[in-house]
Amino acid sequence: MQLQAITHIPLSKDAYMVNENTIVIRLKVGKGDIKSSDVYYGDRVCMSEPILVKRVSMKKIASDELFDYFEGKIKSEYTRVCYYFHIKDIEGKETYYSEYGFSEKMTCCRTQYFQFPYLHRNDMICIPKWTENMVMYHIFPDSFAEKKNYISGRRKVIQIENGLTSESKNGGTLRGILENLDYIEELNVNCLYLNPIFKAASYHKYDTIDYMEIDPCFGTKQDLKDLVNECHKRGIRVILDGVFNHCGSGFLPFLDVLKNGEKSEYCNWFYKLNFPVVYDTIPNYEAFAYVKEMPKLNTGNQEVIDYFCKVGRYWIREADIDGWRLDVANEINHDFWRAFKKAVKEEKDDIFLIGEIWEDSTIWLMGDQFDSTMNYTFSYICREFFAKKIISVSQFDQKIHRMNLRYPEMVTRAQMNFLDTHDVSRFFSDCAGDDRKLRLAVLYMMCAVGIPSVFYGDECGITGITESEYRKTMQWGCEDSLIEFYQKCIKIRKNSKALCTGTYETLICEDKDEIYGFARKTKEETIVVIMNMGEKEQKITIPGAKHQWLDVFSDEKQDGNQIVCKGMSGIILKKI
């Protein structure tokens, strides 16, 4: 038995509350080493000694290249729980595992067990219910539309206060988005995420000058209100981009620092100022990515925290927005985010918060800061497997399972999955012109665990490697089968409880034939997805599923013993 591979961390993704009387317990063990694992639990403050314990059998739920993962659910009548594991390996050897370590015989001393001190209602991670069937459409406002089915691609510059200007590169506006809601609605998405729209100097608007005003290149507050109101009438939610890690060099507090130096009342609003502060090519103050136009805010300062809590509340109250995507979230103080979440939740209790974090986000996703983060890992895996085909089917499966187990289940379901964004090259550019690769990736994204997000124009086959290319103007007038494919996949996703909230189980993982199949299940529904990554047509048997299935694309019935899947294509099947 590989004792060194066995891991459990209490009060983490390995032990978390689902509701007031249910705890999910996970155990990581060496791959192929353990035959079974049970978790024994009891009342940690029971008046008798030894305490009565109950057994819950654990199930192996996933594997990666190094480990197997077991999971069990404790449905406890106790509010204070202690627990330990009884583990058997494939050779019949047994061990007990507790806070105290490993032993051949389990101690009766409850203080040496793993502890879940108290099942507090407020410690549950609660994700807004409306996000369960959410499919997001991500719009870069400058590049999308000026009016219905049109964007000029022409630059414009508008004079604003303090001798500053605001720039638009392609001419997109909020009114243009509003006039194209029919198109957006026909895609079947039910949420819009807009990159920054507040007053700023640059075309991308990540250098905010005024957090309480809409950028004049994009329109007015009334335009935003009209857009959100019309979206809500159509059942579409709206998420705005909040850039609170840094501001633009034209932000009034920073201008005051430039003017008044150490006497400025805003000195403590910024990081590492060297006086006299010089606005030059190489800034003598902390800035985002060393860019002088983006001085870093001191988000540990209470005045700064209070100001941005006010900003967060203001746009909920003013425009009835439904969420915030929070830029450079991992460079901002945790106390800032705790205060921000408390403030915006008081304003609207089902507001949805997404942090821009490119790596493991565990510390931000414990329930006190964000509901979700941008899942760049998902994009990396999909590029390797679908676009570039540089990892095998089994490697893909291992990476997906490891990704899905980074967080508690409800948090994983709320992760923002995407193939590309405004910060990376277009996914289709990695596909070498083969739209079958894109279609397979889209099909998988719509069936995977997590919230799917489509970057504007992906449904039209937009490509782009450099920033100016992947942020190019929307390709209006593009009517082809790729758009229809997106529409169908999104509709299937939204209408399936299993795809939105179900478990994820690998069914087929064949490197030689390049076949991957998995199931998404709830008590009421089972969906099986089969993907053929090879060029040859394959006849596939669904393991243990001899009943009838419905191909949700063709509406044709299929026999589970012989599913025909063409080369470089996928099938979504519903159990009937």
Task: Give the positions of each predicted feature.
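Hydrophobic faces of well-ordered beta-strands that scaffold small-molecule active sites
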Residues: V135-Y137, L192-L194, V238-L240, W324, ...
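Active-site-proximal helices and loops of the catalytic beta/alpha 8
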Residues: V228-I236, H246, F251-G261, R317, ...
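Substrate-binding/active-site clefts of carbohydrate-active enzymes
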Residues: M134, F140-N190, I197-E318, F340-E346, ...
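Short, solvent-exposed loop/turn segments at secondary-structure junctions
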Residues: D142-A145, F198-A200, F244-N245, N330-E331, ...
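Conserved residues at the C-terminal ends of beta-strands
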Residues: N195, I214, D327, G457
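Short glycine/proline- and charge-enriched loop/turn segments
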Residues: K205-I214, F288-K292, T377-I381, E467-Q475, ...
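Aromatic/acidic polysaccharide-binding cleft in carbohydrate-active enzymes
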Residues: D142, M366-S372, R413-D420, S425-D435, ...
